[in-house]
A protein has these predicted regions:
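Short pre-active-site segment immediately N-terminal to redox-active cysteine/selenocysteine motifs
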Residues: 57, 64-67, 110
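Non-catalytic, surface beta->alpha helical segment in thiol-disulfide oxidoreductase systems
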Residues: 110, 115-144
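Cys/His-rich microdomains that often coordinate metals
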Residues: 13-16, 35-36, 75
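A short beta-strand-turn-helix
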Residues: 41-59
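Short cysteine-rich clusters marking metal-coordination/redox-active sites
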Residues: 9-12, 29-32
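Short linker/helix segments within small regulatory modules
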Residues: 18-27
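Short Cys/His-rich micro-motifs in 6-15 aa windows
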Residues: 32-41
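Typically the conserved alpha-helix immediately C-terminal to a functionally engaged Cys/Sec
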Residues: 72-85
Length: 144
């Protein structure tokens, strides 16, 4: 048996200890009873950021804006990736307009931008919209 993974709840930010062998069992948050692992992206906000990047599973953040055409065309690709990566990587969307302070803190210069976090630290960044095979290849190159 391996050490449990620490995974923040996307709904309440509560930190959950989940054994690796139970990741496929759709674990629920001990605090709010919401699903801890989703097969779709969750919304990341300024107040959630510090808690959400700390988890043991990687977190891929799509920084986007409603007025951005490439962001809108990339949204379905990101949704498909979330479904394929459930239990391996968590995916979140950060609205750069609604979270301008966090976007500035992250040094966002263009959108869409993807930022990969692992154990509380940024490990990779990619700008632009691209097809699902290219996104998955980039994530594989990052060890996901």
């Amino acid at each position: 048996m391996t050490d449990p993974l620490l995974i923040p709840c996307p709904a309440c930010n509560g930190l959950n200890r989940i054994p690796a062998e139970r990741l496929a069992d759709q674990p629920k948050c001990g605090r709010c009873k919401s699903a801890v692992l989703l097969d779709k992206p969750f919304e990341l906000k300024q107040g959630d950021y510090a808690s959400q990047i700390k988890g043991d599973l990687p977190l891929l953040v799509d920084v986007w804006a409603d007025w951005c055409g490439p962001c809108k065309s990339f949204a379905p690709v990101f949704e498909q990736a979330a479904a394929q990566l459930a239990g391996k990587c968590r995916l979140a969307k950060l609205d750069s307009e609604a979270n301008q302070q966090l976007s500035a803190q992250l040094g966002i210069r263009s959108i869409p931008s993807l930022i990969l976090f692992r154990n509380g630290r940024e490990v990779a960044r990619q700008s632009g919209a691209f097809p699902l095979p290219q996104l998955m290849a980039w994530l594989r190159s990052q060890g996901i």
